[in-house]
């Protein structure tokens, strides 16, 4: 006896089969129901605030918890919320190190968290097909952005081809949009210059000095004394009073005057330390730089009355030939520290002298380059343990993988040291002589 036929069931079956066939050919983009809450029992506003306190390097790990978390943690709202929840206190943000091992247009930069020892790569910077070998650029952070300014590179359109030229290009990486942006170039091309970011309601960046020297050459290159200031909102550069003399290879810091700290712009000073100006020759053949032992300071004022004052020599004739690597730490007020071989020196501003603060607990092999940065109020001495030799050629170093990274951390308030070891994710050697680093809070 034949089975009865039910049209409704056939219709349902056919519709389901056609639906499945359509879904196999057309895969619409997954949409998340906006009515779903991030955390059950709490409003989305509260849930977003709670998730915004997660340390930045851990965000990629918790994205896969659920669809709503993935949508929020991948959105532009996250970074904006982390920076806007308390503008007066940035200690709640993760203090990270941004490392540029090589030319950022051919080798990606990385973010490093010294607390969790986690690494995260960033996209490549836009490439110019005519320019290669960018080095001696400056990276500085301002808000949720990292700026890459200037540098020295080779240009295939110039002659002779083996002469490096300074560049005036400026790029900015936005952690909100996760993209690189090209900004207005500097008025004067420069590399190896002093630079400092001025946070506030109207963010600004100031640059001073510089030249055209490339890392492939130990001497030669131009020097300059020009000073410029960049307005972030207007995307414009303006000329400021020049340095008292030519100065390249220098470093810059922003210092706030405690008496006028409530005045956003007027209580600031721009310090430019070290560097070199003229040169001399040994036996009439070998060029040798003449390094400066002093510093110059500019008082930054709204009325445009910027003036430079010269600070005398910071050390004697027989102490050291040139300034070492310098960082600034906020110990209630900015304090300068310098790494001089295996010693940490503190700058006594009243005496205008560098005094010994502490020694690195484990002596580094000083035939290797050493990194020196300030993070979370601590000094970080970064030493590559293995896989590096100064006698290796440039090609050989690029073929080898990076070794382990020993980081000695010094707390200036507690006068204590601690050490950690991390494995960098680079597929090439890390050379601290040419590596560019800056810190950022996210």
Swiss-Prot record:
First and last residues of every Kelch repeat: 93-139, 145-200, 204-257, 269-328, 330-377, 390-437
The entry's keywords: Kelch repeat, Repeat
UniProt KW Plastid keyword: no
InterPro entries the record matches: F-box-like_dom_sf, F-box_dom, Kelch-typ_b-propeller, Kelch_1
Keyword Ubl conjugation: no
SMART domains the record matches: Kelch
The protein, known as: F-box/kelch-repeat protein OR23
Organism field: Arabidopsis thaliana (Mouse-ear cress)
Start and end residues of each F-box domain: 37-84
């Amino acid at each position: 006896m034949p089975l009865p036929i039910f049209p409704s069931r056939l219709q349902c079956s056919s519709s389901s089969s056609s639906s499945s066939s359509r879904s196999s050919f057309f895969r619409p983009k997954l949409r998340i129901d906006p009515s779903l809450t991030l955390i059950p029992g709490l409003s989305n506003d509260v849930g977003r605030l709670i998730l915004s306190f997660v340390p930045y390097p851990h965000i990629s790990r918790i994205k896969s918890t659920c669809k709503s978390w993935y949508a929020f943690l991948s959105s532009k709202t996250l970074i904006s919320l982390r920076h806007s929840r308390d503008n007066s206190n940035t200690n709640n943000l993760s203090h990270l190190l941004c490392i540029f091992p090589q030319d950022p247009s051919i080798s990606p930069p990385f973010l490093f968290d010294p607390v969790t020892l986690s690494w995260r790569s960033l996209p490549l910077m836009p490439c110019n097909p005519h320019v290669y070998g960018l080095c001696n650029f400056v990276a500085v952070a301002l808000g949720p952005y990292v700026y890459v300014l200037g540098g020295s590179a080779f240009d295939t359109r110039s002659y002779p081809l083996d002469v490096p030229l300074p560049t005036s290009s400026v790029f900015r990486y936005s952690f909100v949009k996760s993209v690189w942006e090209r900004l207005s170039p500097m008025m004067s091309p420069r590399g190896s210059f002093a630079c400092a970011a001025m946070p506030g309601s109207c963010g600004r960046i100031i640059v001073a000095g510089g030249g055209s020297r490339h890392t492939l050459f130990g001497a030669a290159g131009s020097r300059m004394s020009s000073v410029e200031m960049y307005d972030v909102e207007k995307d414009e550069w303006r000329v400021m009073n020049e340095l008292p003399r030519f100065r390249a290879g220098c470093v810059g810091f922003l210092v706030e005057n405690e008496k006028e700290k409530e005045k956003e712009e007027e209580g600031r000073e721009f310090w430019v330390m070290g560097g070199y100006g003229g040169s001399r020759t040994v036996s009439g053949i070998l060029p040798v730089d003449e390094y400066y032992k002093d510093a110059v300071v500019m008082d930054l004022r709204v009325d445009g009355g910027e003036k430079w004052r010269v600070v005398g020599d910071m050390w004697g004739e027989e102490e050291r030939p040139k300034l070492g690597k310098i960082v600034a730490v906020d110990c209630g007020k900015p304090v300068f520290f310098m790494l001089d071989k295996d010693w940490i020196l503190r700058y006594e501003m009243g005496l205008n002298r560098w005094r010994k603060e502490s020694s690195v607990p484990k002596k580094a092999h000083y035939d290797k380059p050493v990194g020196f940065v300030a993070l979370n109020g601590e000094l970080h001495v970064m030493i590559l343990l293995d896989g590096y030799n100064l006698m290796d050629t440039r090609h050989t170093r690029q073929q080898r993988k990076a070794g382990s990274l020993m980081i000695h951390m010094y707390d200036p308030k507690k006068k204590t040291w601690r050490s950690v070891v991390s494995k960098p994710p680079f597929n090439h050697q890390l050379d601290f002589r040419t590596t560019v680093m800056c810190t950022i809070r996210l």
